[in-house]
Amino acid sequence: MESEVQKKRILSGIQPSGDLTLGSYLGAIRNWAALADEYDCYYMMADMHTITVRQVPAELRRHTLVQLAAYIASGLDPEKNVLFVQSHVPAHAQLGWVLDCYTMFGELSRMTQFKDKSAKNADNINAGLFTYPALMAADILLYQADLVPVGGDQKQHVEICRDIATRFNGLYGDTFKLPDPYIPKVGARIMSLTTPTSKMSKSDKDQNGCVYMLEKPEDILRKFKKAMTDSDACVRFDPENKPGVSNLMQIYSVATGRDYATIEAEFAGQGYGSFKTAVGESVVELLRPIREETERLLADKSYLESVYRAGAEKAAYVANRTLSKVYKKVGFLAR
């Protein structure tokens, strides 16, 4: 018990806005599964963030449940990790509003993700999209997280979280722990198969560029065989000049555990066809047990329900302690 208390805490989550991608698995979930013994881990289905873009309600519910099943199938043991749905813990919305009042307009205006999402959703530039970083800060600060596993493109959100926490602490005394980003060196940023200069994303209009965790093996192989490479016909790791090949090498390296020098030697003198097939097959085999276990878990709705209810209870216990402290410091009258 003593050692558990001293563990550093981790908080992260993924939006259930669609099917989980290979990028989500290799860049995030796979790494999370290895952290439970060393850290006190909280992982959420970030459904509140998801509605900044219009969703089909029934699909959002389905994706949330599938994501929970995929988390577990990927090795996130509910006995070792707190797995919960963001909207099941009201403190997220409650602290989110308080932090809105301590977040400056200029800070939010500079966020690159707001600019990117606004450009993609010009007909729905809502306030939630703009204040997204304050809610994300609430997600992190509620749990007094030490570390936040994020992709390199989300480091800015952790930085603004630290700024908000520092501002609040400066006004009211130590309230929030300042989190640090945790960015894994390998598999941190998996790129699109068709546009390897862009991150693999479920919102990509060209679905051939995105591989899904629960996709059929034949579809995964087809996408890898069509993956963009170059005219050089040489398997060599060079992200600047050979982004497509380098992306495939990174995927193959993470899937097989082989380093880049070994991969280059393995495919020396061969064309890209055999290389792309090998990458596709390695991904199929990597994801096969996860897909099968996810399907098994989805057939046991009562078990999944017990997991997310227990997770919400554990998460709320920690979150409400932080929220009570915040409410007292800002001057809210206790109930």
Give the positions of each predicted feature.
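Conserved nucleotide- and phosphate/pyrophosphate-binding catalytic cores
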Residues: 156, 162-335
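A generic secondary-structure signal for well-formed alpha-helical elements
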Residues: 68, 75, 103-106, 145, ...
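Short helix-capping/linker segments at secondary-structure and domain boundaries
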Residues: 105-109, 142-149, 253-263, 291
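Short, histidine-centered active-site or binding-site loop motifs used for metal coordination
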Residues: 14-16, 47-49, 146-147, 204, ...
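Short, polar/flexible loop-turn hinges at active-site or ligand-entry regions and domain interfaces
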Residues: 56-57, 148-151, 235
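Internal, conserved structured core segments that host functional sites
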Residues: 116-168, 172, 192
